[in-house]
């Protein structure tokens, strides 16, 4: 957070500038357990749908499209490159993935080395279960409709080219039901 210098006097204490930074090019890295590939795909599709395709994402398990690791590519190098390019990392925290070392590693690299925003999304597990260990330092998101809507809106606000479509709440509700069913 940056200090707002316009009120730096003895009469007025400094204010914190808490605005969400707008990024010129947004890439959301969707960190997930490979067994949750369908959930990661549903979340990536949600981001694309509500932003009319302007909010791009990467998920290593993508086998259908072009947002995964290409055949023949060195997977570790590809993942590290995408983490470096990411403006945000959304870690999908499910019963299968909470304690998986790879999700912890990706979140650690993103936050510790690259200073990238890490957002934990608890899917099918209580927030208090995911808000321990390394994810205890983050304000994590639950899978209820209001929280999921707020998370998606936060990601959209960081992208100057994205404007949420009117179907945002409908898309989130449908995706939330699918995510709850699959997790």
Where are these regions (language model features)?
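Short amphipathic alpha-helical segments
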Residues: 42-44, 66, 102-105, 133
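Conserved N-terminal substructure of TIR/SEFIR domains
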Residues: 2-88, 113-116
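Arginine/glycine-rich "motif VI" loop of SF2 helicases in the C-terminal RecA-like domain
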Residues: 49-52, 108-118, 124, 130
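C-terminal interaction surface of TIR/SEFIR-family domains
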Residues: 1-28, 37-41, 45, 56, ...
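Short beta-alpha junction loops
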Residues: 63, 95-96, 122-128
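Short, well-ordered beta-strand core segments
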Residues: 89-90, 140
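Generic beta-sheet signal
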Residues: 92, 121-123, 143
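Conserved TIR/SEFIR loop-to-helix hotspot centered on a Trp-containing motif
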Residues: 95-113
């Amino acid at each position: 957070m940056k200090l707002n210098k316009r009120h730096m006097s003895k009469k007025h204490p400094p204010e914190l500038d808490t605005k969400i930074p707008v990024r010129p090019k947004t890439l959301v890295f969707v960190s997930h357990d490979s067994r949750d590939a369908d959930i990661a795909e549903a979340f990536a599709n949600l981001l694309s749908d509500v932003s009319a395709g302007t909010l791009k994402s990467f998920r290593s398990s993508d086998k259908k499209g072009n947002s995964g690791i290409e055949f023949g590519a060195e997977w570790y190098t590809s993942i590290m490159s995408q983490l470096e390019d990411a403006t945000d990392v959304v870690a999908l925290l499910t019963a299968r993935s909470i304690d998986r070392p790879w999700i912890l590693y990706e979140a650690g690299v993103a936050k510790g080395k690259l200073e990238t925003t890490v957002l934990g999304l608890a899917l099918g597990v209580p927030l208090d279960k995911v808000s321990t260990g390394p994810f205890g330092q983050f304000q994590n998101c639950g899978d209820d409709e209001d929280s999921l809507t707020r998370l998606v809106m936060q990601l959209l606000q960081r992208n100057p080219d994205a404007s949420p479509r009117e179907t945002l709440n409908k898309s989130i509700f449908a995706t939330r039901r699918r995510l709850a069913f699959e997790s």
